[in-house]
Curated annotation (Swiss-Prot):
The lineage of its organism: Bacteria, Bacillati, Actinomycetota, Actinomycetes, Pseudonocardiales. It is found in: Cytoplasm. It is an enzyme of class 1 (oxidoreductase). This is Cytochrome P450 107B1. Its EC number is 1.14.-.-. It comes from Saccharopolyspora erythraea (strain ATCC 11635 / DSM 40517 / JCM 4748 / NBRC 13426 / NCIMB 8594 / NRRL 2338).
């Protein structure tokens, strides 16, 4: 790369999604560098493990949706582009720092305690078994479409108190929103999502229940601190993050196991290794590849590189989790590996509030799938599988499998 050259992720396009780990390996050679994102925005990408952890903890690399949005809109205007993502979906706890982050997170964290999550186990097992019943006797199925997606969307919908009758629409909107390369389609999906959430909230006001959405509404009604805009953004975050990460985690885990027969055999011989298989998947094929945008509130130094004030910053979680300085033989899938410290769910105050739920869903899903179908195997060559084109997410478009008898 010549001096001053800005790597252009748009030029990589779909090839980047299909070859992400090799691209990240090359980027880690220059671990803090300026890049051009898929929508033409210049930003800084941080790829090494220690730098990523530093960035996730440094308050100078801020989550302030209003300020970040100003930077984005200014740069897009300078480039004669327009943003696709609706600002109505942005002011949630993932895009804010304290004190707003503290009060927003406080409203939902009690719904995701270890005790509350464990209480969901029987229902998650029931949903899982019902889905597996539908796979039995089939010669070939798409495991993403018929298992990895419907399980978490059903769980989060029930937790939130939301009917999942429009889940296909919701999935379509989410796919566009996490893509980022289609600003016009993203704008349309944003409008549709805001309209859907507004209707959803209005209906829940008249038909409250024993669910998380009602709890959030009552907090607003009781004079707590959620504005209408914050409520829409919070519900958006919980519904999207509450299923998207887990869809990818389940799919990536099954793919990694089927692609590494020795590890699959080890797990079948010793089911107590299942939690380790989930953690290794989180490291090896991190379902969230990059965090959402941050910005520098002041200049920040990483080694010899100084990121000036007012710059957009991305932390590459997936790249950090394949850093050989932190994980020995990082490109090997090993379910007995000590994975403590991976950053698949983030680090610091923005650590994923739903991590325990995602882990539980994945353990139940993968464990019961392998138990139910001992002859489960791939129905396509690994070279024929395609990764979704998303700068944020790492997940397959489809995962064809043959369940067996």
């Amino acid at each position: 790369m010549t001096t001053g050259e800005v790597p252009d992720l748009l030029a990589f396009d779909d090839a980047f999604a299909q070859d992400r780990h090799n691209r990240y390996a090359r980027m880690r050679e220059e671990p803090v560098q300026r890049i051009r994102t898929v929508n033409g925005l210049d930003a800084w990408l941080i790829t090494r493990y220690e730098d990523v952890k530093q960035a996730l903890l440094d308050p100078r690399i801020a989550k302030d949706f209003g300020r970040t949005q100003q930077i984005i809109e200014k740069r897009l205007a300078d480039a004669e582009r327009r943003p696709g993502f609706s600002p109505d979906l942005g002011p949630h706890m993932l895009n804010t720092d304290p004190p707003d982050h503290t009060r927003l997170r406080k409203l939902v964290v009690k719904a995701f305690t270890a005790r509350r999550v464990e209480g969901l186990r029987p229902r998650i097992e029931q949903i899982t078994d019902d889905l597996l019943d539908r796979l039995a006797g089939r010669s070939e199925v798409d495991l993403i479409d018929e298992f990895a997606f419907p399980l978490p969307i059903t769980v989060i919908s029930e937790l939130m108190g939301v009917e999942d009758s429009r889940r296909d629409d919701f999935r379509s909107w989410t796919n566009v929103l996490v893509d980022g390369s289609q600003p016009e389609a993203q704008a349309q999906a944003s409008v549709a999502m805001v309209e859907y959430l507004t209707e959803l909230i209005a209906k829940k006001r008249t038909e409250p229940g024993d669910d998380l959405l009602t709890a959030l509404l009552e907090a607003v009604e009781d004079g707590d601190r959620l504005s209408e805009g914050e409520l829409i953004a919070m519900v958006f975050l919980l519904l999207v993050a509450g299923h998207e990460t887990t869809v990818n985690l389940i799919g990536n885990c099954v793919l990694s196991l089927l692609g590494n027969p020795d590890q699959l055999a080890a797990l079948r011989n010793d089911p107590s290794l299942l939690p380790g298989a989930i953690e290794e998947t989180l490291r090896y094929e991190s379902p969230v590849a990059n965090g959402t945008f941050r910005h520098t509130a002041e200049a920040v130094r990483f080694g010899d590189v100084v990121i000036p004030e007012g710059e957009l910053v991305w932390v590459a979680l997936g790249a950090a989790n394949r850093d050989g300085e932190r994980f020995e033989d990082p490109d090997r899938f090993d379910i007995t590996r000590e994975t403590t410290g991976h950053v698949a769910f983030g680090h610091g105050i923005h650590f994923c509030v739903g991590a325990a739920l995602a882990r539980l869903e994945a353990q139940i899903a993968v464990g019961r799938l392998l138990e139910r179908f001992p002859d489960l195997r791939m129905a396509a060559s690994p070279d024929d599988l395609r990764w979704r084109f998303s700068v944020l997410m790492r997940g397959l478009e489809k995962l064809p499998v043959r369940p067996g008898a």
